[in-house]
């Protein structure tokens, strides 16, 4: 699985004008299941992100996790993280998991983040979503499992 993690002051996701999820301080996690991924990869990535120390401590160093700060997570599916731009001008997405697998793993990943004790909001898999965020830092991290 691939994830793009952004430290945010706030973030929200809407579909067709309906607010699906919003958080205050925490993480916006854009996530994509890849061909061959399974629940083990989703669980491992969620556990790593839950422990990722990218929030400042009292000394101003990135030494605290979202869980340590009492922050939340907004998990949004984004198959375009599987883009192959090595040839031509149009990205290919054949490395992404098939939609049924992608949705199952997206839901599993979000549930694993929540199981780590992090309040979790989600988007809607496969929908045309509008994501708003206020970056904090900015801090943006790319992770794979």
Swiss-Prot record:
What is the organism field in this record? Cereibacter sphaeroides (strain ATCC 17029 / ATH 2.4.9) (Rhodobacter sphaeroides)
Listed under subunit, the entry gives: Homodimer.
Predominant subcellular localization, coarse grouping:
cytoplasm
Q: Where in the cell is it found?
A: Cytoplasm
Where does the record place a coiled coil?
none
Keyword presence, Glycosyltransferase: no
What gene, per UniProt, encodes this protein?
dtd
- Name this polypeptide is given: D-aminoacyl-tRNA deacylase
Q: Which HAMAP family match?
A: Deacylase_Dtd (MF_00518)
Please name the Pfam families in this protein's record: Tyr_Deacylase
Q: Where does this chain carry the motif Gly-cisPro motif, important for rejection of L-amino acids?
A: 137-138
Q: What is known of its domains?
A: A Gly-cisPro motif from one monomer fits into the active site of the other monomer to allow specific chiral rejection of L-amino acids.
**What is the enzyme's class at the highest EC level?**
hydrolase
Keyword rRNA processing (UniProt): no
């Amino acid at each position: 699985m691939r994830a793009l993690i952004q430290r945010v002051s706030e973030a929200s996701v809407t579909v067709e004008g309906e607010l699906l999820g919003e958080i205050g301080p925490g993480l916006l996690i854009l996530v994509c299941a890849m061909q061959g991924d399974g629940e083990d990869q989703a669980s491992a990535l969620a556990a790593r992100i839950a422990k990722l120390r990218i929030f400042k401590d009292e000394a101003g160093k990135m030494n605290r996790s979202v869980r340590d700060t009492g922050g939340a997570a907004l998990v949004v599916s984004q198959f375009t993280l599987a883009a192959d731009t090595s040839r031509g001008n149009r990205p290919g997405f054949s490395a992404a998991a098939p939609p049924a697998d992608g949705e199952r793993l997206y839901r599993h990943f979000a549930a694993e983040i929540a199981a780590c004790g992090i309040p979790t909001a989600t988007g809607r898999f496969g929908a045309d979503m509008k994501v708003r965020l206020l970056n904090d830092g900015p801090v943006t991290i790319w992770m794979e499992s």
